[in-house]
A protein has these predicted regions:
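Residues that mark the start of a beta-strand
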Residues: 102-104, 129, 254
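Intein/HINT protein-splicing elements and their conserved insertion hotspots or analogous self-processing inserts
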Residues: 6-104, 112
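Beta-strand->loop->alpha-helix junctions that form or flank phosphate-binding loops
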Residues: 1, 12-38, 131-137, 218-227, ...
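Short helix-loop-beta junction
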Residues: 117-132
């Protein structure tokens, strides 16, 4: 096992009679040196990264359109992950007052959805009483969302993205009276919150739930590369009016992206939207 750790870790291993061998030290610059007996070789980190990355670039060139593979290859070293956590963050879970009732949350999913368990767990840890709601529950009328204060539309590939991302899922709401009525009644109330993640975000865009007062609504378009993009990046949270994100203003946090249709096409100027975060680099 090879890993990087502070020098204090050596004492921990010694206490447990575990033998370790130091093979190197972290460096600040671009050049690093490998020593083997009397032989000493110095390499450029940037050059080796390009060599390592080239195979991925060649494969990417066969898949990505509009020069995105070349742009990715030229820019990947300039896109450093930088984080800035809120000053009040201590890494501890919130203390939930067991004497108070938990607000009710519903995790909404469709065939082909995933990550509903992860969202349910996160909501439970945040203090919600969580229930699982499948679209068949809403379509049949078994679930009306009455008494629910928070809904979360999960990610995945609902209906295998046939006809487009979340198109079929949106249709299940639009063309089934009971599901449509349940959703409309939920958003008419003033004591509700909602979140759409990944495919759930695409769903809310398709249903025109974002800035419903606009005459022309935004859409999610295919990525410029014309292919599914998945990667880890960072976003900076701006000043915003979000109940869930306003306290994170000024922070830069890591996020996963994973979409085929992940490009927002917004018809109005930025000031017409409550954009809570932007990519930490262009």
């Amino acid at each position: 096992v090879v890993f990087q750790a502070n020098a204090e870790v050596e004492a921990t291993f010694a206490q447990h009679n575990i033998e370790i061998f130091k093979i190197g030290s972290a460096i600040d610059g671009d050049a690093f040196t490998v020593i083997n007996g009397e032989d000493s070789l110095t390499f450029s980190v940037a050059t080796l990264r390009d060599t390592w990355y080239k195979t991925s670039f060649l494969l990417d060139s066969k898949q990505s359109k509009n020069g995105m593979a070349q742009a990715r290859f030229e820019n990947y070293k300039n896109q450093k992950l930088q984080f800035s956590f809120p000053s009040h963050f201590d890494g501890k879970l919130p203390v939930i007052d067991a004497s108070k009732p938990r607000p009710k949350a519903a995790i909404i999913r469709e065939k082909g959805s995933n990550s509903e368990r992860e969202m349910a767990n996160a909501m439970y840890l945040a203090g919600f009483d969580v229930k699982d709601v499948h679209m068949t529950d809403l379509i049949s009328g078994r679930e009306t969302l009455e008494g629910i204060q928070f809904i979360g539309a999960v990610g995945g590939f609902s209906n295998s993205d046939v006809l487009g991302s979340a198109k079929g899922w949106a249709g299940a709401f639009l063309y089934n009276e009971k599901a449509n009525t349940a959703l409309k009644n939920f958003f008419k109330r003033e004591d509700t919150l909602s979140v759409g993640i990944c495919n759930g975000c695409q769903l809310m865009m398709e249903l025109e739930l974002i800035t419903p007062e606009h005459e022309v609504h935004g859409k999610m378009h295919h990525n410029t590369s014309n292919k599914h993009e998945s990667g880890f990046t960072s976003v900076t949270v701006q000043k915003n009016n979000s109940v869930m994100l306003s306290t994170l203003e000024g922070t830069t946090l890591g996020v996963w992206i994973s979409h085929g249709e992940g490009k927002f096409k917004l018809p109005y100027s930025e000031d017409k939207y409550n954009i809570v975060a932007k990519y930490a680099y262009e």
